[in-house]
């Protein structure tokens, strides 16, 4: 891929999931990449190993030799010293999605959208196409075990991209195939209303060329509602609703799921994916539908799905003892994601006590969805709620909004053993009392709770009597 081997790209906020993925893609494509972030860690260390120059913190001089500066939607351009310095120096400043849209010009784009399931579905499609010998270029907002990273630079004609709806970023992309994986209220700080969000998905889907295809999950009511507004060809998939591609005979096992795919009247039995939960069956149906549209044989698609080995922070098992003690780390941060993850744990590990540990993400999301979180978490046997991870928001702008709102909502929804613990060290101490046989410690959230999951896993390894 000849993308101009000498340009230097500087990325502000390079440690974020989406930004680190595009940094990795640029590095593998031959660009010189530098970047800055307020904190460093495993993600930035991996980029350094690939050749990136990483700065901790933001300073004017760090953009001096750049040909272009890229920033994420989470960065406020008027407040960031590097972006101001770049604009003053006449260096082009663009958002991440604009850069991604430019890179997509070289390939046929397969873009996976949806309020949930984007990362897993993107990784499933990538694995499937790689196993089929298609050599795709891939960019995922997470770390794939199979890919050993978040990107692949391939020689084939397809580019598989996770399409993020936040800040309307996905409207800058140019999909040949657009997947609508799920749709419900999310990112209201961007859209204001669900109707505006639905209109954005319609606009995204209708960017597909006349020879392309839109692939829609009809199990989501809001997707069913927007289908009449699509003016491109589409196919449907689902479990609960009649669709072109469906799954039946679903068997939920510990760590894997088996099912039959019925596609356009033809049945394909004994499909196995090595991840738990019905929500992952839907993700697999999206991938299978995409492969059919590309003309790949069903047998090769099923074999490819069987090679999918999961994502970091997507029901990632951090510790598993012989006595049934487990620690799981998951990125779930929307009520529907939390509900699906808790359900996967309860359905797949029916003889285990499921202890859900949840860190709310964003004050606004916690305020808007506290009751929904309550219902989502109430099925767990015991629940711990951490305080809110603020991300781009400030506590002062949201008085009275704390993790206690979620804890109270869980109690209201019927949760019997519910604890609000303010402080990660205090939470770590509390979880140590649950190091016992047949216990699944399920840590969920998009913030730094992942570090707690790792710490608890280390404690289990050192103190569990049977590992």
Curated annotation (Swiss-Prot):
<dbReference type="InterPro" id="IPR004101">
    <property type="entry name" value="Mur_ligase_C"/>
</dbReference>
<dbReference type="Pfam" id="PF02875">
    <property type="entry name" value="Mur_ligase_C"/>
</dbReference>
<dbReference type="InterPro" id="IPR005758">
    <property type="entry name" value="UDP-N-AcMur_Ala_ligase_MurC"/>
</dbReference>
<keyword id="KW-0132">Cell division</keyword>
<dbReference type="InterPro" id="IPR013221">
    <property type="entry name" value="Mur_ligase_cen"/>
</dbReference>
<dbReference type="GO" id="GO:0051301">
    <property type="term" value="P:cell division"/>
</dbReference>
<dbReference type="GO" id="GO:0008763">
    <property type="term" value="F:UDP-N-acetylmuramate-L-alanine ligase activity"/>
</dbReference>
<keyword id="KW-0131">Cell cycle</keyword>
<comment type="function">
    <text>Cell wall formation.</text>
</comment>
<keyword id="KW-0961">Cell wall biogenesis/degradation</keyword>
<dbReference type="GO" id="GO:0009252">
    <property type="term" value="P:peptidoglycan biosynthetic process"/>
</dbReference>
<comment type="similarity">
    <text>Belongs to the MurCDEF family.</text>
</comment>
<keyword id="KW-0963">Cytoplasm</keyword>
<dbReference type="Pfam" id="PF01225">
    <property type="entry name" value="Mur_ligase"/>
</dbReference>
<dbReference type="GO" id="GO:0071555">
    <property type="term" value="P:cell wall organization"/>
</dbReference>
<protein>
    <recommendedName>
        <fullName>UDP-N-acetylmuramate--L-alanine ligase</fullName>
        <ecNumber>6.3.2.8</ecNumber>
    </recommendedName>
</protein>
<feature type="binding site">
    <location>
        <begin position="114"/>
        <end position="120"/>
    </location>
    <ligand>
        <name>ATP</name>
    </ligand>
</feature>
<keyword id="KW-0067">ATP-binding</keyword>
<dbReference type="GO" id="GO:0005737">
    <property type="term" value="C:cytoplasm"/>
</dbReference>
<dbReference type="InterPro" id="IPR050061">
    <property type="entry name" value="MurCDEF_pg_biosynth"/>
</dbReference>
<comment type="pathway">
    <text>Cell wall biogenesis; peptidoglycan biosynthesis.</text>
</comment>
<dbReference type="InterPro" id="IPR036565">
    <property type="entry name" value="Mur-like_cat_sf"/>
</dbReference>
<keyword id="KW-0573">Peptidoglycan synthesis</keyword>
<dbReference type="Pfam" id="PF08245">
    <property type="entry name" value="Mur_ligase_M"/>
</dbReference>
<dbReference type="InterPro" id="IPR000713">
    <property type="entry name" value="Mur_ligase_N"/>
</dbReference>
<dbReference type="InterPro" id="IPR036615">
    <property type="entry name" value="Mur_ligase_C_dom_sf"/>
</dbReference>
<keyword id="KW-0547">Nucleotide-binding</keyword>
<dbReference type="GO" id="GO:0008360">
    <property type="term" value="P:regulation of cell shape"/>
</dbReference>
<keyword id="KW-0133">Cell shape</keyword>
<dbReference type="GO" id="GO:0005524">
    <property type="term" value="F:ATP binding"/>
</dbReference>
<keyword id="KW-0436">Ligase</keyword>
